[in-house]
Amino acid sequence: MLDAQTIATVKATIPLLVETGPKLTAHFYDRMFTHNPELKEIFNMSNQRNGDQREALFNAIAAYASNIENLPALLPAVEKIAQKHTSFQIKPEQYNIVGTHLLATLDEMFNPGQEVLDAWGKAYGVLANVFIHREAEIYHENASKDGGWEGTRPFRIVAKTPRSALITSFEFEPVDGGTVAEYRPGQYLGVWLKPEGFAHQEIRQYSLTRKPDGKGYRIAVKREDGGQVSNWLHHHANVGDVVHLAAPAGDFFMNVAADTPVSLISAGVGQTPMLAMLDTLAKEQHTAQVNWFHAAENGDVHAFADEVSELGRTLPRFTAHTWYREPTEADRAQRVFDSEGLMDLSKLEAAISDPAMQFYLCGPVGFMQFAAKQLVSLGVNNENIHYECFGPHKVL
C-alpha cells in the first residue's frame, strides 16, 4: 500500500491535472507512439484521432488521483478496463512502457521535481499491479472454459447477412472445428484484423447478438462513415474468410432470476447486446415481464425487427415499442413502428413500474443520458440501470 506522504504528494497534483486536462494525455500518447510505434498495432487509432481515448485516459488518471485513498471505489472502473484489456491481449510488460511514458510526460510538461515523480511512480505501480492481477485472472478463466482459448483463435466467416441499410451480421465458427466458450448475454467479442491496405493491425469489440450455443458466434456491425474496420467488413469480408478472435469479455451483461422483470432499451446499433439478452430470456422461458424499447431513424436502418418479434412471441409477458425519429412515407404506410419522434418512456410508465425491474441501456451516449433521465424521473432506482458505451466509457 501507499504511504501517507506518497498519497499527499499525488493528491497535491490534482489541481494541475485538472487545469491541464486532456492535453496531458495527448502529450502522453504522442510520446508513447513515437518511442514505441509497435503499440499502434494494439491501440484503436480511430479513437486516438477523434480524441475519445485521450479524454478517457485523462478521466481515469484524474479519478485515480482523487480516489487514491479509496481504491475500492475504483474497482468497477478497473473491471471495465481490465475486461477490455484482455480483448486487446494486454501483457504485463506493456504496463512498464506506459509507466515510463506517463512519468516522462509529467516531467516534460510540469517539471515537478523528483519527489513528485517518485510518488507518481509508486502510485502507478500499485494501480498497474491491480490491473495485471485481474487481467491474469480473466485470461485464466477464458482459457479454462470448455471451448476456451488463450490469445487469439482463427475463425471462419460462415454467414454474412445484411440486416438493414447500415447493419450487417457476421457468424463465425472455429477453423479447428472445436467447441467455443460460452459468454454472458451483453458481452462482446474481440475481432483482430490486418488485411492488405491496413497500415496497422486493427482490433475492435463487437457485441455478441444471440444466446451462446457452443458452436460459434454472431456479431452485427454498423457501417460507420469513415470507419476503416466497419467498411472493410461490410465491403470486403466474405463467407469463407478467416479472422482471428479474442475470447468474449466485458463487464456489461444480464444476470437475472427467472422472476425478475427486465427492460431492454436501445437505439440504433445499440440493440446488439440487447439481442443476446432477449434471445437468452426467450430460450430460457423467462416468466417475468420483458420490455423491448427501441429507437431508430426509420425502417431503412432498423435491423432485426422480425427476429425481435419472433422472440417476443415465445415470451409469456412481452411488450415491445419502437420509435422512428424520421419515418419514411413507406414506414407510415406500412405502420411498422409505434411512435414517431424521440423515445418517450412516460407513455409506458405502467410497463416499467415494478421496483424490481432491471433496465439495460445501449446506444449513443446522448440517447442513454436522455433515457436514464426519464427512468429516474419515473422513479427508477439508479442501481437498477445498467448501460454500455461503444468505445471509451463515459459516465451518464
From Swiss-Prot:
PANTHER family (UniProt xref): FLAVOHEMOPROTEIN
Domain named Globin: residues: 1-136
Function according to Swiss-Prot or TrEMBL: Is involved in NO detoxification in an aerobic process, termed nitric oxide dioxygenase (NOD) reaction that utilizes O(2) and NAD(P)H to convert NO to nitrate, which protects the bacterium from various noxious nitrogen compounds. Therefore, plays a central role in the inducible response to nitrosative stress.
Keyword Oxidoreductase attached: yes
Domain FAD-binding FR-type: from-to ranges: 150-255
Protein name: Flavohemoprotein
Catalytic reaction equation(s): 2 nitric oxide + NADPH + 2 O2 = 2 nitrate + NADP(+) + H(+); 2 nitric oxide + NADH + 2 O2 = 2 nitrate + NAD(+) + H(+)
Keyword 4Fe-4S: no
The protein's required cofactors: heme b; FAD
Binding site for FAD: Y188, R204, Q205, Y206, S207, C389, F390, G391, P392
Species of the source: Salmonella typhi
Annotated GO MF terms: FAD binding; heme binding; metal ion binding; nitric oxide dioxygenase NAD(P)H activity; oxygen binding; oxygen carrier activity
CDD domains assigned to the protein according to its UniProt record, in alphabetical order: flavohem_like_fad_nad_binding, HmpEc-globin-like
GO BP term, example: nitric oxide catabolic process
Active site (record annotation): Y95 (charge relay system), E135 (charge relay system)
